[in-house]
């Protein structure tokens, strides 16, 4: 189980990304459309003025059951350990153990 503070920090980051996504997307579109270097520099400073945690790459994929940050399968949102346990119990529909 991950520390509760780390999970809470990640939840806070997700909320901040959601709150600033429109503003960040508009600035990024303007940045890529601008041709003048000085205009790009000005837009870049505005982007830097946004909160750091509003960048989507700062959000960590975590297991929803345990909060572990590593070995998380995107399709299920579970870490590898929980995926294995739940697949053995039959709690994941459509998942079968492979054999050949």
Curated annotation (Swiss-Prot):
InterPro entries: Ribosomal_uS14, Ribosomal_uS14_bac/plastid, Ribosomal_uS14_CS
Keywords: Ribonucleoprotein, Ribosomal protein, RNA-binding, rRNA-binding
GO MF assignments: rRNA binding; structural constituent of ribosome
GO cellular component terms listed in the entry, alphabetical order: cytoplasm; small ribosomal subunit
Domain of life: Bacteria
GO terms (BP aspect): translation
Keyword rRNA-binding part of the UniProt annotation: yes
Subunit composition and interactions: Part of the 30S ribosomal subunit. Contacts proteins S3 and S10.
Family of the protein in this entry: Belongs to the universal ribosomal protein uS14 family.
Role played: Binds 16S rRNA, required for the assembly of 30S particles and may also be responsible for determining the conformation of the 16S rRNA at the A site.
Protein name in the entry: Small ribosomal subunit protein uS14
Native source organism of the sequence: Synechococcus sp. (strain CC9311)
